A protein has these predicted regions:
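Structural motif corresponding to alpha-helix initiation and N-cap regions
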Residues: 3, 39, 64-67
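Short, flexible hinge/linker loops that cap or flank conserved catalytic cores
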Residues: 1-2, 45, 74, 106
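Non-catalytic C-terminal accessory region of glycerolipid acyltransferases
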Residues: 64-168
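A short, conserved beta-strand element in the Rossmann-like catalytic core
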Residues: 1, 14-15, 87-88
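Generic beta-sheet signal
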Residues: 4-10, 78-82
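A short, glycine/Asx- and small/polar-enriched loop/turn
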Residues: 1-5, 131
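Catalytic core of membrane glycerolipid acyltransferases/transacylases, capturing the structured
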Residues: 6-59
């Protein structure tokens, strides 16, 4: 894990990684949907973690909020975690990757850190029941953003995340 902060792009298969990433990358701000705050107890605790909460119905305005608040958090020494597929996907599946994380990294001139794992095999999106097993997390090399555009950055991150997940 680099000493300087940046943008974390993590596969999103379960609730597990939302908790674990807080321990792996301390002093972190997650981009999440605002509706999670409405869950009793859980939402209240979540609000105390300094997340970047967005209303996904706002479309491009939500992206501008992520860029503004994300840049501020990184300048303050926080990691910013995004799930580039936008929502949890079933284990072994692939969602559509958005370019918001790459846009933030370019805005602040920081690297992107890709993260792959197999948590969805044990903490399934489809079930409340958790299965026993060993969750493996792989943190990729820091991906430089200098001289690249959003599409190139996301293609590199997506390829690494998906190919690494296939090996787990």
């Amino acid at each position: 894990i680099p000493k300087t902060t940046g943008v974390i792009l993590c596969k999103h298969q379960s609730a597990w990684e939302t908790i674990a990433m807080q321990l792996i990358f301390p002093r972190q701000s997650q981009v999440l949907k605002k509706e999670l705050f409405y869950l009793p107890f859980f939402g209240w605790g979540l609000a105390s973690l300094n997340p970047i909460a967005i209303n996904r119905k706002l479309g491009t305005r939500a992206i501008k909020i992520i860029l503004r608040l994300g840049a501020a958090r990184i300048r303050e020494g926080w990691w910013v975690l995004l799930f580039p597929e936008g929502t949890r996907v079933p284990y072994g599946s692939k969602g559509k990757y958005t370019q918001t994380g790459a846009a933030l990294a370019l805005e602040i001139k920081c690297p992107v850190i890709p993260v792959a794992h197999n948590a969805g095999a044990f903490w399934s999106k489809e079930s409340f029941i958790k299965r026993p097993g060993c969750i493996t997390v792989v943190i990729g090399e820091s991906l430089p953003t200098c001289g690249k555009n959003r599409k190139q950055i996301m293609a590199e991150a997506e390829t690494w995340i998906e190919s690494t997940c296939e090996k787990l």
